[in-house]
Amino acid sequence: SQVLLPGGEAAGVANMGLKAWGVPAREGKRMLGYVHVRGQVDALEFALERYDGLKVYATNRVEKVDAPDAWRKVAFALVPRVTDPMARLRISALGQGKVWIDDASLVDEPTNRFGELGCREDLVRAFQKQGLTFLRWGGSMVNVKDYLYRHMTGERTFYHGMWSWWSSYAFMIPEFVRMAAEMKVPCAFSINAYEPVEDAVRLAAWLRRFDLPLYVQIGNEECAGYNPYCGKPDLPSVRRYGESVRRLVTAMRRENPKLKFVNAIMWQAKHMDILEEGFRQTDGFCDYWDLHVGCWGAGSGKNVREACAAFRDMVRRLNPQSKMRLAIFEENGNHHDMRRALAHASILIACREQGDFLLTSCPANALQPYNHNDNGWDQGQVFFTPDKAWLQPCAWAQAMASAAHRDVLVASVVEGQAVEVSATRDDAGRSAVLHVVNGAPEARTLSVAFGGGGWTLARAVCLSANSLTDHNPPDDPERIRPRDVTETFRKTPQMPPESYLVLTYARP
C-alpha cells in the first residue's frame, strides 16, 4: 500500500486480516506487531478499531519515520480495551511526508517459548495433539531462485514466491528448526537445489547447535517439469541436479557430519531412465529418496507398496550394497475429509510393513486457513481462523496411530471380508495393537484370533463419519473425532462402514 500525505493531514489504510475475518482483539491482552516501511513521515499511528472504524480499542504511535532509501521494520504494541473477534488494524501516517508500507503483522504477546519463536501457540498445540514424531518443511516454495538461506537470517524482507508473487521470509528454515527442537521432534527441511555452497556451509555450521536428527532435502520434486526452475524429466536436468547434490552434500557433511541428506528427484515410474540416472548421480551422497504418493481413500497403501517395490528393485539392479532408503515427505490427496483419514490410515499400514527401510510418512499439508487455499491443495490437517485451530479427520487418524504405536511388527492374515490390517506389539510381548481400515460402505464383523493365548481386549477406539466427504467445520470442530467404543466392541465386534479402528490387547 502507498499512503500520500497532503500537508498537515493524516491518511492511512485499514486491514481486517486474511479473508477479512477480522483481528481477534481480547480485552487487556497485549498484542505485538510490526510493519515494513520505506519513506519519510512525521509519525505513524497504529490502532485497533471496530470493523467500521467508529470505535477505537487501542492506539500507539511511532515518531519520525526516516527510511528514504531502504525498507525498515517498525515494531509496535497494542492493548485493546474491549474484546472484539472482528476488529481491524489501522495504520495512519501523520504530518507531512510520503511512505510505503508492506508486510504487517499483529499477534498476541507470547506466553511460552513457541510464541517467542514466532509460532502461533494454538497451532503448535494442534501439532502436539496429533502426537507427531517427525516434521517436514518443504514443498514447491523452494523451487524459485530467491529461496536462499542467506535471506533467512537477520532482517527479513520478501521475495517473488512460487505460490504468491509477494512471499515473506518471516518464518523460514531457522524458525522451523527451532520449533522442532523445542517440540523435541526430528525434522526435515528443503533447501534450494542450487543453493550457493558457501551459504549451505553456513547453514550446516548453524545446525550444529541442535541435538536432534536433522534431514536436509536438496530441492523439491526436482526433474519433474512442474515449473522452469525444478528442471525437466530428462538426462541433462538430472545430471545438473546430481552435480549440485554432490557439491552441496560434500561441503555440508564436512562441516556437520551428523546431517542426513535426501534426494528430491520426483519419483515418476514412467521415467525410470531418469530415476536410474538420478540414483547413480546421488548414491553414496543421499541417505534417503523422497517419495510423494497419492492418497484418495482406503486402499491408498497400495501406492506405497508399489513404489517401495520398484525402488528396491532399482537398487538391487544398480547397487545392491547401497544404503539409500526411502522417506515419504508428502502424502497428497487434495481433500481433508473422512476419505483422507482412511487414506492416511491405509498408508500407515503399508509403511509399517516396510520397517526401517522407510523413514517416515508425512501427510500434506500441515496447515490450512479455513475456506482459503491459494494453490489448489485443499488438504490441511489442521485448519485455523484468526482465533482458533482445530483438527481435521486425517489429523485425528494420525493421533490415533501415534497414541497406539508399538515398535515390533507382527505377521497378520485377513480372511473373508476385506479389511486392511497391520499388527504390532511392544518389546515385552504384553501389549499388541491392531490397526484396521474398513473402506467398504457396509459394516464389518471382526473375529480376532492370536497365535498365542492370554490376550484380552483392553481398548477399542474408532474414527467414523456419516459420509466420506464429512469434515470438521469451525462451529463443530470435533464433529469427527476418535470415540472410545471398548464396551460396545466387546459386546458386538463390528466395525462401522468406512472407518478406522484401533484395537489394543493385553496379556499378563
Regions found by a protein language model. Give the residues of each.
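Acidic, Ser/Thr/Pro-rich beta/coil linker or hinge segments at domain junctions
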Residues: 454-495
